[in-house]
Amino acid sequence: MSIGEVSDSAGHLASLVLPIEVAPIAPLIPEPPATAEHIFTLRHVYHHGTHKHPSLHRKHDVTPSNADVWLAAEDGYEAERIGPLRARSNALRIQRLVDRRPSVVDPMVAQSRQQGFVSVLSPSAWTVDDVAGPDVTDKGTVLTMALMAANAYVEGPGKADWQDVGAPFNRSLDFGWEGDGLRGHVFADENNSTIVIGLKGTSPAVFDGDGTTTNDKVNDNLFFSCCCAQQGPWTWHQVCDCATGTYTCNNTCVTQALREENRYYQAARELYANVTEVYPDSHVWIAGHSLGGAVSSFLGLTYGVPVVTFQAVPDALPAGRLGLPVPPGADPNAPQSRDYTGAFHFGHTADPIYMGSCNGATASCSFAGYALESACHTGHECVYDTVGDKGWRVGIGTHKIVAVIRDVILKYDTVPECKFTPECRDCGNWKMYESNGTETTTTSSAPTTTSISRTRTETCKTPHLKSQQQRQRPRPRPLHALPQWEGGNPDSPERNEEM
């Protein structure tokens, strides 16, 4: 065979060889975070003004000598110091913005507030992450988060050395600043890998005295009423004038009132920005009770961080009015239908505030001037059935955080299953419409209250058990005597009673 024939034969064989297919390289998918144990200590206390002093922002750094965590006294329970705060983290899936820095997100929220609707972002701006979040199936972790929320109500320790954050505060306005605003206690674990922010909630004057009460009532009725606390019982404290007819509401008007810069949500965002500037590489969890729980949820939806609340007022209604960023395909007006938010709302069935039923003409909340008409929570609801399990009657007295810790969380052997409730709807009787903001609104009154699609009991009565004054009970076992806690019970610090 000649060289030419060999060459032709080799070329023919080469043409018969099939090309080698190269398998596509799969994208690297990070492993979900493993379960871990954390021990938290109190590191800082932040205070941000809202109404009287909206530019005030102060910080107190806690030293090891005064880093004690206190559970406030309440209804026969003495204030006491709590031992180590232990919590377990586990993988938690959250859909959130890729770039979640406050310097990036806050202008988006401001733009939505100015234009009256949520800006549409590209799908590439969103991601679904498995983050290290609190293990809400673990009783000890839920208890620790509740104690952090409760600690946010304790004023002290003593005369704290407060430092201004940002521009110096006018010292001539110093008097009374501590009673106005939003306060957050910041806890961190041993290596600062995770921090928890506990936010201060509501302290209604009709139940517990003054403090931030009056401001909280304004915010509560802006947040949680269908339309400015209008067209309800005469006792409701009206906060704006957006009703244009019988059960007809200018939602643009409500949205504008809700987004004023001196409101709690804006103060909470600034507080969050300053805390995360101190801990830029840490995982952030947020805990709160009552109004503090709802505001915590707003922060979680804004920045994509895990949130655990206790007896939070249903938050979906105001969340849909705040201009929060929403992923593609989500309904901005129904945030309760959005999954993977990282929010878990713990509560029990005897609390009319948590259940969204404290709004009838004879309800305690209505007598106090509160128009709490919202019924839907974002994220997941984790409900203890104290009515069915313990025979409790619905009553406002069951809302307090210390009672929830003592009589609910500690008494149950396990935590409830957390359920997603996207079918819930708020303000079913109302017709909401958007406008260009130039209409003149009028006020009209009606003796009835707004109904909702979710069935709730509207009876606000005292608990089935005898009142604290009537029943004799043994002295409660102090928390530091329980297996999870260590420490003593020295003289209690100055404190602020809460609802």
From Swiss-Prot:
UniProt cross-references to InterPro entries, sorted A to Z: AB_hydrolase_fold (IPR029058), ATG15_Lipase (IPR050805), Fungal_lipase-type (IPR002921)
Membrane topology term reads:
Single-pass type II membrane protein
**Pfam families per the UniProt record, alphabetical:** Lipase_3
**In the UniProt record, which is one GO cellular component term?**
vacuolar lumen
Region Disordered, residue ranges: 436-499
Q: Which residues lie on this side of the membrane: Lumenal?
A: 31-499
Q: Where's the active site on this chain?
A: 290
The protein's location, in the record's own words, is:
Endosome, Multivesicular body membrane; Prevacuolar compartment membrane
What GO biological process, any one, is recorded here? neutral lipid catabolic process
EC assignment:
3.1.1.3
Lipid metabolism found in the keyword field: yes
Q: Topology check: give the Cytoplasmic ranges.
A: 1-9
Record flagged with keyword Transmembrane: yes
Question: Keywords in UniProt for this one?
Answer: Autophagy, Endosome, Glycoprotein, Hydrolase, Lipid degradation, Lipid metabolism, Membrane, Signal-anchor, Transmembrane, Transmembrane helix
Q: Which reaction does it catalyse?
A: a triacylglycerol + H2O = a diacylglycerol + a fatty acid + H(+)
Q: Which residues are glycosylated?
A: 170, 191-192, 250, 274, 436
> Compositionally biased, Low complexity: which spans?
438-454
The record's family statement is: Belongs to the AB hydrolase superfamily. Lipase family.
Described by its record, this protein's role is as follows: Lipase which is essential for lysis of subvacuolar cytoplasm to vacuole targeted bodies and intravacuolar autophagic bodies. Involved in the lysis of intravacuolar multivesicular body (MVB) vesicles. The intravacuolar membrane disintegration by atg15 is critical to life span extension.
The entry describes its oligomerization and partners as: Binds to both phosphatidylinositol (PI) and phosphatidylinositol 3,5-bisphosphate (PIP2).
Return the PANTHER family for the record: LIPASE ATG15-RELATED
**What protein name is recorded for this chain?**
Putative lipase atg15
- Please name the source species: Chaetomium globosum (strain ATCC 6205 / CBS 148.51 / DSM 1962 / NBRC 6347 / NRRL 1970)
Starting at the broadest rank, the lineage of the source organism is: Eukaryota, Fungi, Dikarya, Ascomycota, Pezizomycotina
